[in-house]
A protein has these predicted regions:
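Short glycine-rich anion-binding loops that position phosphate/pyrophosphate groups of nucleotides
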Residues: 11, 67-70, 94-97
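Short, surface-exposed alpha-helical segments at coil->helix boundaries
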Residues: 17-24, 47, 100-103
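Short glycine-/acidic-enriched loop or helix-start segments at secondary-structure transitions
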Residues: 15-17, 73-75, 99-102, 121
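Loop/turn-to-beta-strand initiation segments
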Residues: 2, 85-94
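S-adenosyl-L-methionine/SAH cofactor-binding core of RNA-modifying enzymes
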Residues: 30-89
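Conserved RecA-like P-loop NTPase ATPase core
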Residues: 5, 63, 93, 126
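N-terminal beta1-alpha1 ligand-phosphate binding loop
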Residues: 1-23, 27
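Structured adenosyl-cofactor binding patch, chiefly the S-adenosyl-L-methionine
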Residues: 100-157
Length: 157
């Protein structure tokens, strides 16, 4: 597993940063994790900075977080992500989202929810769900399956 997070802006409250870093540290047990914070700026400059980062990862699977994307359950994500056999780059935009040209470059768009979240919460959810997905895919005990989920999981294997 090789994951890169491209994130616009710095978290102002260090406690959010601490929690995000903890999930990424745990995720590191399953492979390499890169974390790139780009400065908050106007949308065109953010797009330019993201494009520059993507140039370094031309063959990567690109995932943009956006409200118009598809929602996944944790179990669906745990099935999808580990099946990708190349580096995965996740992009979280700034206050105005991600530029259309970056979304067009994306292989898929992932919506955390139909609701809109503050940047800090979206980042923390991303980090936590990535850890949960790989932990679940590797038989870890972090995610607690209901009896029905266990039964469905066995059927789908």
């Amino acid at each position: 597993m090789l994951v890169k997070l491209i994130l616009i802006g710095k978290l102002k409250d260090r406690s959010w940063e601490t929690h995000c870093r903890e999930y990424l540290r745990r995720l590191g047990a399953y492979g390499k994790v890169e974390y790139v914070e780009l400065p908050d700026s106007d949308p065109q400059n953010e797009a330019k900075l993201i494009r520059r980062e993507l140039e370094r990862d031309r063959n990567a699977e690109v995932v943009v977080l956006g409200e118009e994307g598809r929602e996944y359950t944790s179990i669906e994500l745990a099935r999808r992500l580990p099946s990708i056999d190349r580096k995965i780059v996740f992009i979280v935009g700034g206050p105005y989202g991600v530029a259309a040209e970056i979304k067009q470059r994306a292989d898929w768009i992932w919506s955390l929810s139909k609701m809109t979240f503050p940047h800090e919460i979206a980042r923390l959810l991303l980090c936590e769900q990535l850890y949960r997905a790989w932990n679940l895919a590797n038989g870890g005990s972090y995610h607690h399956l209901s009896d029905e989920q266990k039964q469905n999981s066995r059927k789908n294997q």
